[in-house]
Amino acid sequence: NSKTGLSGLEISERLEINRLTMTKYLNVFAAEGLLKQKNIGNVNLWFTEDGTEQYHFPEDYFKIKTKYFEYLTSRKENIIYNLIRNCFHSAAEPMKIITEIILPAIYSVHDLLDQGKIGRSELNLLEKIISNSIQIINLEGVQSDPKKNVVVISADYQSVLVSEAISASFHTDGWQVYSLGDMSPSIDVLFDLDLQKFLTKIW
């Protein structure tokens, strides 16, 4: 919580870990977006990113849901992404992140649009942030079962985010997911044949 940051040497001494080993860990945490590094002369100072915190699940899902929506409506992108990463590092279930945090946020931002509290431009920005949050979940390494395959299609542009969330939930459950996005412009008399042609390529 230090506002001035700590050097790698200070951190390694406090944790009683070899300095070189500690540096490797610090670089990994920085790559994950949990820490930021500032060079001052020959010294590297390390700071925790905003939003970095240890959570306890399942009791903290409601707390995270509230924070996520608060940060989302304040357009605090980096803090939101750190929040999702923190959930992973706090051993949250990926499926629960989607059902307890992401999906409620999707429905809530559409409610804000319906109530006239935000416009289309702001909705697009908030949806992009939610979509990026979903991609963080998709980046988590999961061993997929070659026998479990699913194609996810969005019926219109309004349900694209929901289809992305559904795709991510299948992914976290070990499915090989083919997410086609909004297919409404492609639905015509030849759509069934087109889809069958695609399916023969992947299955």
Segments (PLM) and residue ranges:
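Acidic, two-metal ion nucleic-acid-processing modules in DNA metabolism proteins
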Residues: 7
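Short phosphate-binding/catalytic loops that engage adenosine nucleotides
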Residues: 15, 34, 174-176
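Residue-level marker of alpha-helix boundaries and capping positions
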Residues: 16-17, 157
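Short helix-capping/hinge SLiMs at alpha-helix to coil transitions
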Residues: 1-4
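C-terminal regulatory/effector modules of DNA-binding transcriptional regulators
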Residues: 116-119, 132-203
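A short acidic, leucine-rich amphipathic alpha-helix
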Residues: 10-12
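Long amphipathic alpha-helical segments
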Residues: 17-138
